[in-house]
Structures are given as C-alpha cells and as structure tokens.
Amino acid sequence: MIQDAFWGILIPFLGTSLGAGCVFFLKNALRDGIQRALTGFAAGVMVAASVWSLLIPAMEQAADLGRLAFFPAAVGFWLGILFLLLLDHLIPHLHQNSLQAEGPKSQLQRTTMMVLAVMLHNIPEGMAVGVVYAGYLAGTAQITAAGTLALSLGIAIQNFPEGAIISMPLRAEGMKKGRAFWGGVLSGIVEPIGAVLTILAAGIVLPALPYLLSFAAGAMLYVVVEELIPEMSQGQHSNLGTVFFAVGFSVMMALDVALG
C-alpha cells in the first residue's frame, strides 16, 4: 500500500514534468486555440475529480449522519473555497494572458509570478491526491486502490498540458529552454509536497477525512471558476475551450467509474 501511495503521488508530478519538456520539441509558443483547448480539458478533469473522487466519497463516509450526511462535505467545501481565496490575496501571481498581477504588490519578475500562479493552482490538486491516498492507507471502504489510481492518472493527464502551458510562455518571454523547462517542473513540485502533508494531516485526524476530501474539492473548484474558465473563454476560441472541458470531464468520469 505504501508503494501504491508513493507512485500515486509521483504520477501527477511526472505529468507536469513531461508537459514542461515540450519546450525542447516545440519551436513556437502554443497557439491561442490550443491553449484554450488544453485549459478547458484541465478544467473538465478537475470538476469531474471534485465530484466523483472527492465530494461523493465525502458524503458516503458521513452516511451515518443520515439526512445530515451533506454537512461535512458542505463545511469542508466552503473551507477549501475560503483557503484558496486567502492564498489568492496573499501570494503575488500573474495568470496566463493577463497583463495585471493579482495579490499584494510585488517587484517579482513577470515570469516568476506566472510560475507562482500555476503553483497556486496546483496546491489543491496535490491535496486531492494526498487525501484520497490517506483514505486508502487507512482502509476506508469508499476509497479503493483503483479509485486512487484513477484520480492520480486524471490529474497527471491534465498536468501534461499545464506543464506545456507554463514552459512555452516562459520560453516566449525570452527564457532559455533549460530554465523554461525547470520553471514548468518547479510549478508542479507543490503537488507531491501538498500530497504528503495532507496524508500526514489526515493520519492524525482520520475522523476528519470527509472534511478533508470536500476541502480539496472546494479548493479545486475555486481554481476552475476563478482561473481556468475565464482563461478558456477569452478570445475567438471559447467554444473550443467548452468542448474540451466536456472531453476532460468525460475522461475523468470514465476513469473514475471504470477503475473505481
């Protein structure tokens, strides 16, 4: 089980690293249409993962509360939203295709704030992977080895385009290929760190697992609504983003049902 958790935590990070490696093979920055499609796909995966892999298991684990089984999921969900809202105000960052940075005023370089934006985005994904593996290691009936693998694979699939989305613009900003690659890799390092910390926290307070599952869901959905949906809806390719949102949602849903 420990070995399963190790690889489950590492797989999403490998997805980001492989995506960042696109900077060595693609000469030009990603076209707007491709960026919209990749962003929409990532958003679809995250929404499906939030529902099938996090919120539903959270309510199933609280089934002994009867009609109040929704309560832990609702509380954790709102705490996740508020946590990301707080980070959004505390960390200076710059979203893709945005001219104005968010968060406190900072003298950080534009490229650094772009990496910070993706790192902020990746925090809830690492927490999501960590909390499902915490449930798996604890022997929770609602969380299976196949289900945890489905979530890891789904996050890894959507991390691949994210790695490219950060490394290619860094290259377009004038950064050398090697540094742009490591910038993409660095943006994903928070995921395994967040996963390990979440596993440790869940191990200490196992009865709070339903709250932690829904906390991760709330944090992920905050990122989708605040960042990904606006990015995929800009410009002339918004329909493409919507179509690939549906593709990403379907892929993650199929993975969870087929493997879970």
Q: What does each model-identified segment do?
A:
Residues 1-260:
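Intrinsically disordered, metal-sensing/regulatory segments
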